[in-house]
Amino acid sequence: MNDLFSNSFKKNQAQLGDVEAGQETMNLDKFFEDVENVKDDMKGVEALYKKLQDSNEECKTVHNAKKVKELRAKMDGDVAMVLKRVKIIKQKLEALEKANANSRNVPGCGPGSSTDRTRSSVVSGLGKKLKDLMDSFQGLRARMNNEYKETVERRYFTITGEKADEQTIDNLIASGESENFLQKAIQEQGRGQILDTISEIQERHDAVKEIEKNLLELHQVFLDMAALVEAQGQQLNNIESHVAKASSFVRRGTDQLQDAREYQKSSRKWTCYAIILFIVIFILLLIPLLPHIMLMLK
């Protein structure tokens, strides 16, 4: 009867273990599917970044206001698409974070478990990739601003034959009102001769300002996601710290248990030695007395 109950208990335990293992596997399968979706979205953002880079390089070689306007429209569309995709990525990351929190309530997947560490580690990896993307777009924004400033400076020199000071260039960039700063050239050369250059500068100004506005909004979304992922990374660090401490306690406990066992073995060994020694001494003491004992018995 005891064997029957014992076997039944073991069977139930095995079935429970199988159920928990199945839940854990399903848990991770769905998780990795969601992670792949986020990675695909990131690849799309990377492709758009490459397009923006190419458009920016092309824009540097263009001297026609109409062409600048076309490139501006193209870049505006690409930046808007980037912003849209990044917002979707942010929503998916938030969903992953929520799923990770729910996963910790599943038996066998609690804080510090291999499943929880895996999930947290993967999301942290996505965060690092996002940071690289954020840095890339920040770098592009800085390059566009610097290149725009250099272009305005060159155009000013081409029209006026004079090298503009820093204040003049900054005012041109800030206002975009090229005519106000090029009145002397207009009076000397005629409005028609420099109209295209003025239009080009204006288009570049509008393009840079619009793209910068969108890139700043994009940067804010990136910062929000970075904060989310940083919290996930901190949680992972805490989990790993607790696991390390637990492992240390386990190792220490194992060492202490081993020491106790060695001490126990040593104690038993010396007890045996003491008993044997006592028996030997008893026999040695008994031998001289044997003749007297034998006489008494007779």
Swiss-Prot record:
Residue ranges of coiled coil: 25-155
Q: What organism is the protein native to? A: Arabidopsis thaliana (Mouse-ear cress)
Assembly with partners or alone:
Part of the t-SNARE complex.
One Pfam match = Syntaxin
Q: Where in the cell is it found?
A: Membrane
Which family does the record claim for this protein? Belongs to the syntaxin family.
Q: Which PROSITE patterns match?
A: SYNTAXIN, T_SNARE
Under PANTHER family, the record lists:
SYNTAXIN, SYNTAXIN-124-RELATED
- Output the InterPro entries linked to this UniProt entry: SNARE (IPR010989), Syntaxin (IPR045242), Syntaxin/epimorphin_CS (IPR006012), Syntaxin_N (IPR006011), T_SNARE_dom (IPR000727)
Please tell me where this protein is predominantly located. membrane
Q: How does it sit in the membrane?
A: Single-pass type IV membrane protein
Gene Ontology terms: cellular component: membrane
Signal peptide boundaries: none
- Where in the sequence is N-acetylmethionine found? 1
The record places domain t-SNARE coiled-coil homology at 198-260
Keyword list, A-Z:
Acetylation, Coiled coil, Membrane, Protein transport, Transmembrane, Transmembrane helix, Transport
* Positions in the Vesicular compartment: 296-298
State the superkingdom.
Answer: Eukaryota
What residue ranges lie in the Cytoplasmic compartment? 1-274
This chain's function reads: Vesicle trafficking protein that functions in the secretory pathway.
GO molecular function list:
SNAP receptor activity
This protein is called Syntaxin-125
**An example Gene Ontology biological process:** vesicle-mediated transport
> Gene3D superfamilies in the record, alphabetically?
1.20.5.110, 1.20.58.70
